[in-house]
């Protein structure tokens, strides 16, 4: 029996979740061993959506990762009439299917960048992939930013040389706080409504975006795992985290999509940092 595109995409997002959680737990173990501490582990919580589907939220609060969440979800049903006009292909009957993975990491150390990543596959009367990854350092380092971008550029160039400059630009434009006239972090890539007419190619690209993240971000975290930091640096991190909150509540499409489709509120707002200061 032929496996549907929906199932192919959903299975990959589950596999990627397992790979990411395993790698992040390994980092916690490496740190805990040197400090004589018990390493943190992910706690998984399942949820069901009224109307169809559900997901699993994986959350870890450790000594390295102050809060890291990896969500997978597969939901289906009908958009509300007022939301249909905003989604391509949903105008007529409002029916949709959406599966994806979403990851947000907030680190205890203010020297280690926060990171956001997601990839998804959506079907209405049309179908497409979307997603990307972006880095939010509080103390940016050029070599670190370059390494993060290089990983995604390599994934993009494998498929289309126009992808990286286009998706980088879309990331810069998307992760921008208009009310403050400043970017959120140092960017990465962001793509949406990707349908080249070749599902296998678009799916393979989306897989490689996930693998790129898996190759580069743990390396960045490990490079600063044991660097000392000051209370002043931590204070600055907490204040800058406020920008993260502002963006996610005011502009984030995933937050809006989740709330409009009656998703799990805890999973949707998992992206918010555990501690933040507004001065």
Curated annotation (Swiss-Prot):
Superkingdom field: Bacteria
Main subcellular localisation: cytoplasm
EC number: 1.3.3.3
Stored HAMAP family: Coprogen_oxidas
A GO MF label: coproporphyrinogen oxidase activity
GO CC terms of this entry: cytoplasm
GO BP annotation list: protoporphyrinogen IX biosynthetic process
Pathway this chain belongs to: Porphyrin-containing compound metabolism; protoporphyrin-IX biosynthesis; protoporphyrinogen-IX from coproporphyrinogen-III (O2 route): step 1/1
Subcellular location: Cytoplasm
Species, as recorded: Rickettsia felis (strain ATCC VR-1525 / URRWXCal2) (Rickettsia azadi)
Main function: Involved in the heme biosynthesis. Catalyzes the aerobic oxidative decarboxylation of propionate groups of rings A and B of coproporphyrinogen-III to yield the vinyl groups in protoporphyrinogen-IX.
Subunit and partners: Homodimer.
Pfam families: Coprogen_oxidas (PF01218)
Site (Important for dimerization): 179
Protein name (Swiss-Prot/TrEMBL): Oxygen-dependent coproporphyrinogen-III oxidase
UniProt-annotated binding residues for a divalent metal cation: 106, 116, 149, 179
Co-factor(s): a divalent metal cation
InterPro entries: Coprogen_oxidase_aer (IPR001260), Coprogen_oxidase_aer_sf (IPR036406), Coprogen_oxidase_CS (IPR018375)
Broad class of enzyme this protein falls into: oxidoreductase
Positions bound to substrate: 102, 118-120
């Amino acid at each position: 029996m032929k496996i549907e595109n929906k199932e192919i995409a959903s299975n990959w997002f589950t596999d990627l979740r397992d790979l990411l959680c395993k790698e992040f737990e390994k980092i916690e173990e490496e740190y805990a061993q040197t400090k004589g501490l018990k390493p943190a582990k992910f706690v998984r919580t399942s949820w069901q959506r009224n109307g169809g589907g559900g997901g699993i939220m994986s959350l870890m609060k450790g000594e390295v990762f102050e809060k890291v969440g990896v969500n997978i979800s597969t939901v289906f049903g009908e958009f509300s009439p007022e939301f249909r006009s905003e989604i391509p292909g949903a105008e007529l009957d409002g029916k949709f299917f959406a599966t994806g993975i979403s990851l947000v990491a907030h680190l205890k150390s203010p020297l280690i960048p926060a990171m956001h990543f997601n990839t998804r596959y959506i079907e209405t009367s049309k179908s497409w992939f979307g997603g990307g990854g972006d880095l939010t350092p509080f103390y940016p380092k050029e070599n670190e930013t370059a390494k993060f971008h290089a990983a995604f550029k390599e994934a993009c160039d494998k498929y289309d040389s126009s992808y990286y400059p286009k998706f980088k630009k879309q990331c810069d434009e998307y992760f921008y706080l208009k009310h403050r006239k400043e970017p959120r972090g140092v960017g990465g890539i962001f793509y949406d409504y990707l349908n080249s007419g070749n599902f296998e190619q678009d799916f393979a690209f989306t897989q490689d975006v996930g693998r790129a993240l898996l190759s580069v971000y743990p390396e960045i975290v490990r490079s600063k795992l044991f660097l000392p930091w000051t209370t002043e640096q931590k204070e600055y991190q907490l204040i800058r985290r406020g920008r993260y909150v502002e963006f996610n509540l005011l502009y984030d499409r995933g937050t809006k999509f989740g709330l409009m489709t009656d998703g799990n509120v805890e999973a949707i707002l998992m992206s918010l940092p555990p501690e933040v200061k507004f001065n």
